[in-house]
Amino acid sequence: MNDSQSWSTDDVSVEGFERFIIEYSDMVGREMGGYYYTEIGGTDIKYINSGMGKNNTRTMSYPGPGIFRVRADLYGRVAPHTNWHTHPTNA
């Protein structure tokens, strides 16, 4: 992930994702959750996985399918760094 938005490479910053998912969570009135991933042995966040939100409530989120179900090519290359979730302001 880059530190700033890069429209030419479709890279999104962690901060940009966080702003988006917090605003989205507030808009739909549901907690959202998922994981940040790093390359194995690394510390920089390279991938973000977000749950679908289908069965989420204002105070509970489900991380959804693991990143390897949607990106099998990452298996053995990345590891979970942090579990994250939002708190909607209207909760």
What are the language-model segments listed below?
Residues 1-80, 89-91:
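Conserved beta-strand-loop surface patch within small alpha/beta domains used
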Residues 86:
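Conserved residues at the C-terminal ends of beta-strands
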